[in-house]
Amino acid sequence: MIAAGLSPVMLAACAPTVIPAGRTVTSPHLTKTAYVAADGTVLPLAVWPAEGPEKAVLLGLHGFGDYRDGFEDPAKIWSKDGITTYCYDQRGFGASPTRGRWAGIDTLVEDAITVANLVRAKHPGVPFYLIGESMGGAEALAAVDRGLQADGLILSAPALRGRVVVGPLASGALWFFGHTVPWLPSGPTSIDFRPTDNPKALKKLQNDPLWLHQTRVDMAYGLVEAMDAGYDAAKRVHLPYLMLHGMGDRLVPTSTVRTAIEIMPPRADSKLAFYEHGYHLLMRDKQGPVVAADIAAWIGNHEAELPSGADAEHSEPKLAALWGTKR
């Protein structure tokens, strides 16, 4: 009723702020510390080179509020396994120039595809994998669906709670606030939901100036846009994939994982892993090294059992049963 009383002009004036990529001014390229996009935007980049012979290369897409350092701990472990890891601050996050503003899923996905192409060109002949955490998982699915080339996909607590999952009431409320008061703080952040059981990691996040501690409603509205794209793309995933879920995750609940499993195509070279004591930020958890080791093992052999035994067949019974019907 309230929305019906607002004129189209008023709604347009209060539309969510989106800052997509601008016109092309340069050829996209990587430096030692940044990804320079075609529109000249400089996005900070972190690289953790493999120690010894390089067996694989990973490109990480971080989650909502996070930035490139979100992959620091696992990347150091993967480095010892011969895996090089790249991660850049996505537009709107970390030290990006448009921090706190949504870039739009099309721009975010195009960045991911471009960086993937640049990374693959720097490592010819080396197996290339895409890993996305939370929001990054949704973006990774969308990017693969739109042509990103990779040898496999790793989804850590993928955020797939789009409109189909949350329902019309919640999504309608978010649309209303996003189009009337887009500047309004969106409320509790992921830190308020205890995203990890690791007190040192949690304290670091709380004091990290590059973590996005407060977001606008229109950023949350954009996140739903990304989750919608990821959910839709999940139906058509055509790569080997490893999906990881912590049973203590308060941001991506088990029901969301079940919904995702129901629509993802069955593949003998893919795995679902449940961590009984895992939270949302699995790779920052106390058992983060265990999760990182599982990822490295899967990259080495898609069909072998994971070292931790977290494979769905050996963990949460109800979801394992559902997963079994998809094999």
Per-segment meaning from a language model:
Residues 64-76:
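The serine-hydrolase catalytic nucleophile loop
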Residues 75-99:
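Conserved alpha/beta-hydrolase
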Residues 5-37, 41-50, 319-327:
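An N-terminal hydrophobic leader/cap segment in hydrolases
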Residues 237, 243-245, 249:
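Short beta-strand/loop motif that positions the catalytic acidic residue
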Residues 239, 253-263:
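Short alpha-helix in the alpha/beta-hydrolase fold that links the catalytic acid
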Residues 133-216:
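Alpha/beta-hydrolase-fold enzymes
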Residues 271-327:
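Catalytic active-site module of serine/aspartate enzymes centered on a nucleophile-bearing elbow/loop
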Residues 65-68, 93-127:
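Catalytic nucleophile-loop/oxyanion-hole region of alpha/beta-hydrolase
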